[in-house]
Design a protein with these regions (language model features):
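N-terminal ligand-binding/catalytic initiation module
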Residues: 1-109, 117, 127, 296-299, ...
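NAD(P)-binding Rossmann-fold cofactor-contacting core
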Residues: 149-176
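Rossmann-fold NAD(P) dinucleotide-binding segment
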Residues: 193, 204-221
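Short helix-loop-beta connector
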Residues: 123-130, 152, 217-218
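Short glycine-/small-residue-rich Rossmann-like dinucleotide-binding loops
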Residues: 201-203, 226-227, 247
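Short acidic low-complexity segments
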Residues: 177-194, 211
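Adenosine-phosphate binding glycine-rich loop
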Residues: 8-13, 229-320
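Glycine-rich Rossmann-fold phosphate-binding loop(s) that bind the pyrophosphate
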Residues: 135-137
Length: 320
């Protein structure tokens, strides 16, 4: 069994473009009903919005089976620890034997951004050139990286309650992607005027509902990476098409207290990719997606990392 640390995973050299492409394949399989993925069970240690989730999935077309064991602890930033952490176990779908254990911090960051890009391909205007980012952390970075694969991005409008985080973010995005980054002083400035809006703060059971109705432009698209945490219900109701990556799992979240004031779901991402449900149809419609982050995302990426690591001699082989 091959163990891959976070640095090993990164060293395989997998690109965001490859991840976006593989996720689209996986969601097409899901849209055909060819993916096995039960709603993720979880535990919630401590108080507030802490979670530890088990996320299993089997994608026959990609010969991928396994599970991610992932945690999210919002207070970890104060401890100078990652908000998201965990491990991924990849199994051989023919024998059931585990073939790899790998750190999942980088995988989670990259596949979440990639899912936004796949959603935006079907729900955003294809000439979208500006992105408003609220929350200049890991997901604020990976979502811009992924959107830059699919869209002719020119400008990022960045807001974060921590000004130092916003300044560091602006420099990094400019240096890495050559994009013009404007830091703004309030959330509305990052929403109004942006072709694409990404909210990427902590996931909260009770939304702080900062983004109000009327802020989002006609024709814009929003990716709610932090669920509905940032959004007032009236702002959500302005959506022409409110989508998600998995309707069944969204219903599960509603049962445990999340998403209490959202519009009816138009489609999940598999239905958009397969054409079962319509994506964007006019330049004027406002579209949104609340992608939950699925085991499918991780299990689409994990085999690519594993096979590349084996080919390149990366990682540590563990003996029984």
């Amino acid at each position: 069994m091959l163990y891959l640390s976070q640095s090993d995973v990164i060293a395989t050299g997998l690109t965001m473009s490859e991840i976006v492409d593989e996720l689209e394949v996986a969601f097409r399989e899901k849209g055909k009903g060819l993916v096995e993925m039960p709603p993720k069970p979880g535990i919630h240690p401590g108080n507030g919005d802490n979670f530890i989730h088990a996320m299993p999935a089997y994608i026959p077309a990609l010969k991928s089976a396994g599970m991610k064991w992932v945690s999210g602890f919002p207070e970890n930033e104060k401890r100078r620890l990652p908000y998201i952490s965990g491990l991924l176990i990849l199994n051989d779908p023919e024998t059931g034997l585990p073939i790899s254990v790998m750190d999942c911090i980088w995988i989670t960051a990259m596949r979440t951004g990639a899912a936004t890009a796949v959603s935006a391909k079907y729900l955003a205007r294809n000439d979208s050139s500006s992105v408003g980012v609220l929350g200049c952390g890991v997901q604020g970075r990976s979502n811009v990286e992924a959107l830059a694969v699919e869209f002719p991005l020119e400008k990022v409008i960045a807001y974060d309650i921590n000004k130092d985080s916003a300044r560091l973010y602006a420099k990094e995005i400019t240096d890495r992607f050559g994009l013009d980054v404007k830091m703004v002083d309030n959330p509305k400035q990052a929403v109004t005027g942006s072709d694409i809006v990404v909210t990427a703060g902590p996931i909260l059971r009770k939304p702080h509902a900062t983004i109000k109705a009327g802020w989002m432009d006609e024709g814009a698209f929003a990716s709610l990476v932090d669920f509905d945490s940032y959004w007032h219900p009236d702002a959500l109701r302005e959506s022409s098409k409110f989508c998600t990556d998995d309707t069944a799992q969204l219903r599960h979240y509603q049962e445990i207290g999340y998403f209490q004031n959202i519009p009816p779901v138009h489609a999940d991402l598999g239905e958009l990719v397969t054409g079962v449900k319509s994506g964007r149809q006019t330049r004027e419609e406002k579209n949104m997606t609340a992608n939950l982050g699925l085991a499918l995302d991780d299990m689409a990426v994990a085999p690519l990392i594993y096979h590349r690591a084996v080919e390149q001699g990366i990682g540590t082989w563990l003996t029984p």
